[in-house]
């Protein structure tokens, strides 16, 4: 039976990562693949949704002349409009990516790529998020100035996706992170989230009128424990596959309830 797949991202509808993933998925599977993605770069937007301004959907042509839908909003907006206005139904799968830059650790809540995947899962679709490690922000925010091998990552995502098609989907979201030197033979490791992906840094600067302004930046963390997504990608150079859930309830709920319920 033909699958319905909604393909989204946070790097914008004209990203080469999105195009590579669309082409590989379309060629491999019996699927209707519909692209609904932001008009502009939306990195770091998380699962933000537009409540105070109207949204527009514009049909557009991708680089291979196939059709996509550009949304004047966030990745989450793209999923909402994709489900309710473009497809007018919940797809079988929402696939978000290929993101330029890895999405690792608990900081993934800031990721528009993951935000879209979580929104897809919230609507009842099976969701995957996929990201490719890059070594510098230059590659992430100035796509096209240096070559990035999206096709290898797209094929790795395809191969991982295949593993879950024959089984009941095991969780709400599958988060896939691919090291920048990966091949199709790179080992795949099932991981948990690391605590941190970056060590945050705030740089203060002074404008011509002697007022302070700030840039937020971070330094990659390399020394997370074995078994985490950060360690798998950055140290072992493996593909990381992390199962995620929409339920953010603390794991120690019973202990918490026993300790605190009588205090309220």
Swiss-Prot record:
Keywords: Cytoplasm, Hydrolase, Metal-binding, Nucleotide-binding. Binds 1 divalent metal cation per subunit. GO terms for molecular function: 5'-nucleotidase activity; metal ion binding; nucleotide binding. One of its GO terms (cellular component) is cytoplasm. The keyword Zinc does not apply. PANTHER family: 5'-NUCLEOTIDASE SURE, PHOSPHATASE, PUTATIVE (AFU_ORTHOLOGUE AFUA_4G01070)-RELATED. HAMAP family: SurE. The keyword Zinc-finger does not apply. It is found in: Cytoplasm. Its cofactor is a divalent metal cation. This is 5'-nucleotidase SurE. Its EC number is 3.1.3.5. Belongs to the SurE nucleotidase family. InterPro entries: SurE, SurE-like_Pase/nucleotidase, SurE-like_sf. The gene is surE. Nucleotidase that shows phosphatase activity on nucleoside 5'-monophosphates. Its main location: cytoplasm. It catalyses: a ribonucleoside 5'-phosphate + H2O = a ribonucleoside + phosphate. It is an enzyme of class 3 (hydrolase). A divalent metal cation binds at residues 10-11, 43, 99.
């Amino acid at each position: 039976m033909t699958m319905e797949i909604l393909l989204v991202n946070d790097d914008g509808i004209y990203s080469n990562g999105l195009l590579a993933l669309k082409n590989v998925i379309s060629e491999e599977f019996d699927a209707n693949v519909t692209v609904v993605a932001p008009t502009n770069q939306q990195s770091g937007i998380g699962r933000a949704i537009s409540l105070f301004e109207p949204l527009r959907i514009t049909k557009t042509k991708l680089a291979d002349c196939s059709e996509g839908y550009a949304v004047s909003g966030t990745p989450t907006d793209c999923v909402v409009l994709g489900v309710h206005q473009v497809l007018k139904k919940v797809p079988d799968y929402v696939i978000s990516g290929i993101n330029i830059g890895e999405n690792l650790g608990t900081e993934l809540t800031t990721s528009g790529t993951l935000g879209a995947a979580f929104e897809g899962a919230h609507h009842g679709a099976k969701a995957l998020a996929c990201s490719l490690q890059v070594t510098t922000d230059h590659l992430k925010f100035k796509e096209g100035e240096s070559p990035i091998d999206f096709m290898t990552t797209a094929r790795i995502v395809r191969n991982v996706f295949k593993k879950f098609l024959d089984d009941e989907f095991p969780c709400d979201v599958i988060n896939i992170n691919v090291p920048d030197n990966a091949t199709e033979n790179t080992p795949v490791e099932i991981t948990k989230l690391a605590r941190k992906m970056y060590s945050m840094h705030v740089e203060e600067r002074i404008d011509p009128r002697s007022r302070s302004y700030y840039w937020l930046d971070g330094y990659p963390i390399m020394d997370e424990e074995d078994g985490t997504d950060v360690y798998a990608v950055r140290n072992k150079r493996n593909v990381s596959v992390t199962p995620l859930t929409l339920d953010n309830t603390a794991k120690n709920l019973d202990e918490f309830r026993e300790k605190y319920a009588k205090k309220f």
